[in-house]
Amino acid sequence: MALISQLFQNYSFSSQERFLQYVQIDTQSDPLSNSSPTTEKQKNLGKVLVNELHALGISNAELDEHGYVYASLPSNVEHEVPGIFFCSHMDTSPDCSGANVKPIVHPNYQGHDMILPDDPQVVIRLAEHPDLVEQFGNDIITASGLTLLGADNKAGVAEIMDAVSFWTQHPEVPHGPITIVFTPDEEVGRGTDHINLAKIKAEFGYTLDGEKRGHLENETFSADYFRIDIQGVSQHPGFAKGRMESALKIASEIIESLPKDHCSPETTEEKEGFIHPTDMRGSVEEAQIEFILRAFETEKLIEYVSISLPKV
């Protein structure tokens, strides 16, 4: 530990520089796509990562047809050591634009309002985000106000790449076999659909996709997605009595019927699951509502649907 601490003192960390580069590469996934990856542009970041890994001397780094990046470092100790792997996802949420991201570094945060220049009405205030009190003195990175930043999970990608850089620069630091995996399509629930487990020679693994430094989670929820398609009956408004059936009104009634005090993200915590409408669109003639489901017990996923939407 003393050796590593000393090396860290002299090491030029690159995670911030890498992060600022990665977030400018659009990698939004698409829940409506049937391809794998759901968007080809996710491979653009994968190609960058493979090239950087090759430059670090990791010659086995590869990007497969489904958009997964695999790389491994051999053990550098003579005795047998359990393998470990580190994983992060490259895609960003489809809920907000990931194109033309302009990251902004706010240095030495002291509790002041952070105004995002491309939309001055978007202001990050300490009073509205009390967890920021723990970041006094740190640099904070935001988007410019019009896009997603993409810290979920390009922060994890940058951290892993920085760690690989450290290991390759300091082979005197002992370690067992290490596998690196970067995945596509996590944001749309397909991050492991085509993962090649044969390439992961590890007995333990960590996904770097959490919260603040020092926070460790040892379990996660089950997840699912579903969509309700509503077919209405369109008529000229002047002759609609007894004929028109508005798909939009039906969709609104479905949303209104959802629980107000439970089974929703804004009313749950810890291991409480939820059903959450993420998108609604349509017209009088037809409408769609998209939902995500989360539960720590897989069998409860369908239970939340039957409880929340008994008439659908």
Locate predicted features.
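A non-catalytic alpha/beta surface segment that caps or lines the substrate-entry region
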Residues: 34-81, 85-87, 91
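A common structural junction motif
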Residues: 90-91, 260, 309-312
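Predominant activation on well-ordered alpha-helical scaffold segments within soluble catalytic domains
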Residues: 16, 20, 47-50, 157-165, ...
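Short amphipathic alpha-helices in soluble, non-transmembrane regions
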Residues: 86, 303-312
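Midchain, well-structured core segments that form catalytic/ion-binding scaffolds
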Residues: 138-151, 170, 185-307
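N-terminal capping segment at the start of a domain
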Residues: 2-6, 12-40, 141-142
